[in-house]
Amino acid sequence: KNMITGAAQMDGGILVVSAADGPMPQTREHILLAKQVGVPSLVVFLNKEDQVDDAELLELVELEVRELLSIYDFPGDDIPIVIGSALKAVEALTATPTTKKGDNEWVDKILKLMDEVDEYIPTPEREIDKPFLMAVEDVFSITGRGTVATGRIERGKIKVGETVELVGIRNTRSTTVTGVEMFQKVLEEGMAGDNVGLLLRGIQKEDIERGMVIAKPGSITPHTQFEGEVYVLTK
């Protein structure tokens, strides 16, 4: 459930596979779910390279992963695959926090992974000119401040002091955004593509929940009938 919630918001993803074990049943499941929820691009990291001495085994695992990606309509032959060890990179950085590019082979492999992500996964066009809309992913109560709803802004912008509507599940109600935060940084505004927390005036935690949306007043209405597509994941 958490994987689906997160993946549905992604511009791209990193598929991590153990180089020592190869693709596991959950690897297939994650690739399938990524395709079903519309993750457009993937980059692969073959982890635990330090546990594999046989270069042919690494090649075999890479081939398996590429075939699996192709089965689920990802471009398996073209997707970048980086081989390394997250643990070895963490150990190197823990021992020498000032490690820079070129100082350690394991750290360099992680940097190469991020370079591939930057190059292969395109930054999509953000719909910042459309009416503000954010699906509520989680809700928190902060003592002394109020209720914070978190989520990824799907479209538009939101500024501190603007009025919004809480739509869905319960009766639609209005409130004012008194704070916008992203990764513990206070912002003046958030925009499409940002994962933010919105502090909402006069709203209690029980007034809002996942499944509701926060939107520009009058821009969206709840419906009791809709058409949808269901994919039943079998074991």
UniProtKB/Swiss-Prot annotation:
**Chain sites annotated for binding GTP:** 47-50
- Where would you find this protein in the cell? Cytoplasm
- Keyword GTP-binding assigned: yes
Superkingdom: Bacteria
Q: Where is the signal peptide?
A: none
PROSITE patterns linked to this entry: G_TR_2
**Catalytic activity as recorded in UniProt:** GTP + H2O = GDP + phosphate + H(+)
Which keywords label this protein?
Answer: Cytoplasm, Elongation factor, GTP-binding, Hydrolase, Nucleotide-binding, Protein biosynthesis
- Return the broad EC class: hydrolase
The EC designation for this entry is 3.6.5.3
**Cellular component per GO, a single term:** cytosol
* Domain tr-type G residue range list: 1-125
Task: Establish whether keyword GTP-binding is in the entry.
Answer: yes
Q: State one Pfam family annotation.
A: GTP_EFTU_D2
Q: Which GO terms describe its molecular function?
A: GTP binding; GTPase activity; translation elongation factor activity
On subunit structure and binding partners, the annotation says:
Monomer.
Q: Which family does it belong to?
A: Belongs to the TRAFAC class translation factor GTPase superfamily. Classic translation factor GTPase family. EF-Tu/EF-1A subfamily.
Its biological purpose: GTP hydrolase that promotes the GTP-dependent binding of aminoacyl-tRNA to the A-site of ribosomes during protein biosynthesis.
Q: What is the protein name for this chain?
A: Elongation factor Tu
As recorded in Swiss-Prot or TrEMBL, the protein's gene is named tufA
